Swiss-Prot record:
Pfam families in UniProt: Peptidase_M48
Principal EC category: hydrolase
Record-given protein name: Protease HtpX homolog
Record gene name: htpX
EC number: 3.4.24.-
NCBIfam families per record: PRK01345.1, PRK03001.1
Amino acid sequence: MNTLRTAMLLAAMTALFMGVGFLIGGSGGMMIALLIAAGTNLFSYWNADKMVLSMNRAVEVDEKNAPEYYAIVQALAKQAGLPMPRTYLIDNPQPNAFATGRNPQNAAVAASTGLLQRLTHEEVAAVMAHELAHVQHRDTLTMTIVATFAGAISMLGNFAFFLGGNRDNNPFGFVGVLAAMIVAPFAAMIVQMAVSRTREYEADRRGAEICGHPLWLASALDKIARGAERIPNPDAERNPAMAHLFIINPLHGERMDNLFSTHPSTDNRIAALQEMAQQMAGGTQAAPRPTPRQAGEQQPSGPWGQAPQAEQPAEPERPKANPWGRNPTGPKGRWS
C-alpha cells in the first residue's frame, strides 16, 4: 500500500511539473519538464534525506557525545524491530523532530536541542517513537520526496514569470504564466497535506504503541506545539516545503487549525491519544490534559521500566529537572 501511495504521489508531482512546463512553453516545455521531473525523482530517492538534514544543519551523534538521546533511540528501535537509524541533533531552541530516509535500513531521525532541553525523558521517548513509526511505515521516503518536489515546483512556478511571459511557444501567454505561478505551488501544497495529515495520526498511534503509553506523546505534542508557536525556526522558515516532515509544524505563527495546514490540529491529535490511553487502560471516563505524572500511574508496556518523573512547570525558559538538565555534551559543546 505504501509503495502504491508513493507511486501515485510521484505521478501527481510529475504531472504538476509537466503542467507547468506546458503553461510556460507548450509541448516542448512539457517534455523538458518531464525530463526534469524524472531527474528530480531519481535525485530525491537517493539524496533527499541528505538535503533535508543539511538544510536543517543536523549533526550526527552517537553514544559517546549524546549517550542518553542515543540510548533512547536505540531502545525504541529494538522495541519496534527496526535497524538502528542514524541519529542527528539540530542546534535549534524550538522543540521539534523529524525522520527521513528512503527505507528503514537507510533511515535517520533528528531532534532539536530545544526538544531535549524542554521535554522529560518519557516525552522525548514518545516523540522519537513517533518518528520511528514513520520509518516503520516507510512514510519517510514519501514525505521526503514530496518535500523536495514541493520546493522544486514552487521554484519552477516562480521561474515561469521570468521565462514564460514572452515566449512564442507559450500557448496561453501571460495568463498561463500566472496560472503556473499560483496554481502549481498551491497544488503541491495540497499533495503535501494529503501525505502529512493522514500519516501523522497513524504515526501517533504506532508511536504510542512503541513507547508503551499514549499520554507521554500527548504531553509532548502539547509542549512542542506551544514552543513552536513562540520560538522561530529560521531554517524551516527558509525552506517551508520541509514543514510537513516535522512532528509539529515548525513555521512560526502558523495556525494549526488552518484549513491548509500541513499538520492536523494538535488538540485533535491529543484527543485521539487520550482516547487510545482510555482503551488501553479499559477506562470509560474522559481523560484530563496529559502529564508525565499521569502517564506513570500504570507501568508502560514499552522499553521503559519505571514510572516517569513529575512534569515541570509549563514551558520553562530553562529546564529544572529532566535528564537533559545535567549539561550533556553534544557536538557543539554543552546544551544547557
